[in-house]
Swiss-Prot record:
It comes from Prochlorococcus marinus (strain MIT 9211). This is 5'-nucleotidase SurE. GO terms for cellular component: cytoplasm. Nucleotidase that shows phosphatase activity on nucleoside 5'-monophosphates. A divalent metal cation binds at D11, D12, S43, N101.
Amino acid sequence: MKPLKILISNDDGVFAEGIRTLAGAAAFRGHQVTVVCPDQERSATGHGLTLHSPIRAEKANELFGKGVSAWGCNGTPADCVKLALNEILPEKPDLILSGINHGPNLGTDIFCSGTVAAALEGTLAGIPAIAISIASFQWRDFSFASQLALEIAEEALTKNWPQKLLLNINTPPCKSSEMGQLGWTRLSIRQYEEQFTRRIDPRGNPYYWMAGNAVKDIDSAGDGPSQWPSDVAQIESNSPSITPIEPDLFWRGNISDLPAINLKNYFSR
């Protein structure tokens, strides 16, 4: 296939090994690669935008290999993609990749994910987009995930890529020789035990550190073909997952299941 114009972003920042590996792999395959990503760690920022302070971007080519044009931006992941599409890039890219994230983006955790938000900006702009994550904060070999994402993108772009489709890929933290088959999955619904650590600052005022542990994964039966496993189950079986996502959050249950609100009792004020 002809070389692609690829925009790459992330939420781990411009110094993260995951994005540098992905950008290098894309350039090695002959693609035209531009990186526009946060200049620092921006994990768990979701789809936040910077509206009350200036957004700045500086060249960061020296952090990447040959053939990669890079920018570090002081904004959120979503800011970075918006800025790239509207100011930095001379023309619309063929593909947006976000990652490789240092840690999983599974189930309903995607609502907090800056990685997925960056890819979603591409989807909203009508550009094919993929978010890529490794399901471990300790695993540091990003080569397999890079090749997997690029091969999937190259194949999918020669076939049918529906409008509003975002692909969310997670790979297990193990060698490729130990992995099972890549499979289509649906989002799990994750429930957490929230934890806050309360501390006192030198002025005697309390402050908090937030953490949490996933205590339950609810299989989201009915979302996608019923025979598909959840993304969490797929990763737990040491197999890579690929989950199709769209930005339309409209509820698709039965009308009879909605609360029986008498709408005629309400009027416009």
